[in-house]
């Protein structure tokens, strides 16, 4: 039941002093034309009803605090609770964005220090912390690309090259910025085919969007050559930082030749994510693009920290105020807590865990591409259909009954029946071994009775959804019964 369905007319969870009721007149504070004419359709519940309702929902929810969460390309690592305490300090949590600059110098220092550290980690020259999510960062980067070529007078550059192994939001972000997306095929080893890239490069190409390692978990070993090809053509090279967790302290996007980078603080730098946010997708650029960053940017002068707005070619604001500040605080705390050596070690263990799990699982389900991976890997689930009579979806649904969150499935699209698995560095060997045992048990079940696995899950509040009806007759908002 929803909280609305538990509503009982007249039931409340609070009372106001009788003598104060007549003193509180909304019209004293809110213009008449903005006052509601009718009561809002809010649920009427007692405090204990509300507490019990949401406590029950938490029992039905699943998070990295509950167990293994191996969603590929999502980096569902554990989020240190110390970071939450730091972000909740009153000096941070009670700030208001309209406070005078001289009174929020500490907050600006946090932002400036994070910008500086992210530049050092990625090899960029400047950063903005405004974007509220990864895809928002992508759009920001693409708008910078667009403005850059407008200023140069190269308006013929209307295309963005995206490999078929790209992170899912790349083509959408490029399209939203007004570019035509050109997809190029990967080669048999799962990385960019240089011949295909060369054939696609011409004076109409504004940028190439890449993730490295790519979404298959494979490092684009020809990245230096790709950067040379792009820059020789006058094309910018864009780095999707979704998979930065694999290479921290080992190699920097800026050193590979990338001009623009977006990061996901809610992934790589261990701030909570899922259920829509809050996230943070900072964008970094090389020196020749600094003047195109959105305003304002935090800068340090002899008088203190300022919000700089006089960038000559800025794309303008891309979000209200200054980004999701609480996420920024948590990310800075995480980086300072680990330090350079700690971040490097985190990437090393992330890659080690992925390769250990890949090696063990490949004995049950073949990998899509052979050889070592980075932070994640993709299994080819066509064997499930041929030998066990089940699909990747069935395996994923049955995992729920064992208390394990399924990996990403059916992505990337270039692998049929794909399972994309990213264990992250915060899981121990016992948890990885348990996951392997769960997969083994499910395959044994499928061998004996495929239909049993096909009808899973059995232990969850919601069973199999009618996906056909859901797609053809979607209900995306709550409607009161009387309507």
Swiss-Prot record:
Its EC number is 1.4.4.2. One of its GO terms (cellular component) is glycine cleavage complex. InterPro entries: GcvPB (IPR023012), GDC-P_C (IPR049316), GDC-P_N (IPR049315), GDC_P (IPR020581), PyrdxlP-dep_Trfase (IPR015424), PyrdxlP-dep_Trfase_major (IPR015421), PyrdxlP-dep_Trfase_small (IPR015422). It catalyses: N(6)-[(R)-lipoyl]-L-lysyl-[glycine-cleavage complex H protein] + glycine + H(+) = N(6)-[(R)-S(8)-aminomethyldihydrolipoyl]-L-lysyl-[glycine-cleavage complex H protein] + CO2. GO terms for molecular function: glycine binding; glycine dehydrogenase (decarboxylating) activity; pyridoxal phosphate binding. Keywords: Oxidoreductase, Pyridoxal phosphate. Coiled coil: none annotated. Its cofactor is pyridoxal 5'-phosphate. GO terms for biological process: glycine decarboxylation via glycine cleavage system. The modification N6-(pyridoxal phosphate)lysine is found at residue 267. It comes from the Bacteria. Belongs to the GcvP family. C-terminal subunit subfamily. The glycine cleavage system catalyzes the degradation of glycine. The P protein binds the alpha-amino group of glycine through its pyridoxal phosphate cofactor; CO(2) is released and the remaining methylamine moiety is then transferred to the lipoamide cofactor of the H protein. The glycine cleavage system is composed of four proteins: P, T, L and H. In this organism, the P 'protein' is a heterodimer of two subunits. This is Probable glycine dehydrogenase (decarboxylating) subunit 2. The lineage of its organism: Bacteria, Thermotogati, Thermotogota, Thermotogae, Kosmotogales.
